[in-house]
Amino acid sequence: MENKPHILVVDDNAMILRNIKCILDPYYSVAVAPSGLHAFLAIGKKKPDLILLDYEMPEMNGKEVLEKLKSDEEMKDIPVAFLTSIDTKEVVVELLALKPAGYLLKPVESQALLNKVFEIIGK
């Protein structure tokens, strides 16, 4: 059994979590988390090679999750790509200011998702 790169998908929308998991599952080991708080529990169990992170979530949004990741020595090097359905100039500027590994607009097409993941983790 080959050792597949591990991806954590964080989104408060269960349908999006299922869809992204179905797209990535043939190629990667995939875990899902319905919130930022659940993401940190999942990271504690298995450190991912990439986090696909919803930008707009209740309780702890994507920006807050990324800031917490970057402030932690053990998690700061995990690449994060944002998922968002908002494509206004202001949001894009705010996203890019956080220096993510990338971002994708939702709904994301299968090939665009696979291309972005491959671009970031190279596997």
Regions from the PLM with identified roles:
Residues 46-52:
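Active-site beta3 strand of CheY-like receiver
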Residues 64, 87-104, 115:
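Alpha4 helix (beta4-alpha4-beta5 surface) of REC/receiver domains from two-component response regulators
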Residues 41, 63-76:
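Short amphipathic alpha-helix used as the core "switch/output" element in two-component signaling
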Residues 57:
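Receiver (REC) domain active-site loop signature in two-component systems and cognate sites
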Residues 15, 108-117:
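C-terminal output helix
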Residues 32-41, 62:
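Helix N-cap/capping motif at the beta->alpha junctions
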Residues 14-31:
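Two-component/phosphorelay signaling modules centered on CheY-like receiver
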